[in-house]
């Protein structure tokens, strides 16, 4: 009986610590989701503003090229649809999100379109990406249980953005900016989706459907 009474304070302290860790984890998830939502909105606005500077025929042509082309970050293996996203573990979604954010650290500094607002946005984006990367890394550490086992493909090196965009052709400057902004918007949407699903799973909500 005495041993039971001795164990009770230990169990209570353990329970409080566990609850505190869960609350801190949710707080970090809330911050991360809010940050990536803001980045996604900024990406959408920058893309729309840039499209507004193009002639209708030019816009249609670039859109056709982009649909047939690919983003540099497509080298990162990620879920191909909603069903696969929901089947993925929280840890896998966090690692993919981390890689996607990391892949934009350099190209975010090259969004120097001839528009002062966009240049200011590109500086803000670089800072926000860095903060989000740190936050996701903390979430990975907080969610990790034992040794993570992922395919080697999940950690393959990305080709450098500079080399990729050097091969865009004669009108590469306009096309390069279009593809950078379109790919950035697409990737921020991906990260927003993955972090939202991961946050929902960690909150133990009954329904985490997209």
UniProtKB/Swiss-Prot annotation:
InterPro entries: 4_helix_cytokine-like_core (IPR009079), Somatotropin (IPR034975), Somatotropin/Prolactin (IPR001400), Somatotropin_CS (IPR018116). Disulfide bonds join 71-183, 200-208. It comes from Coregonus lavaretus (Common whitefish). This is Somatotropin. The lineage of its organism: Eukaryota, Metazoa, Chordata, Craniata, Vertebrata. GO terms for cellular component: extracellular space. Its main location: secreted. It is found in: Secreted. The gene is gh. Keywords: Disulfide bond, Hormone, Metal-binding, Secreted, Signal, Zinc. GO terms for biological process: animal organ development; calcium ion homeostasis; growth hormone receptor signaling pathway; hyperosmotic salinity response; magnesium ion homeostasis; positive regulation of growth; positive regulation of phagocytosis; positive regulation of receptor signaling pathway via JAK-STAT.
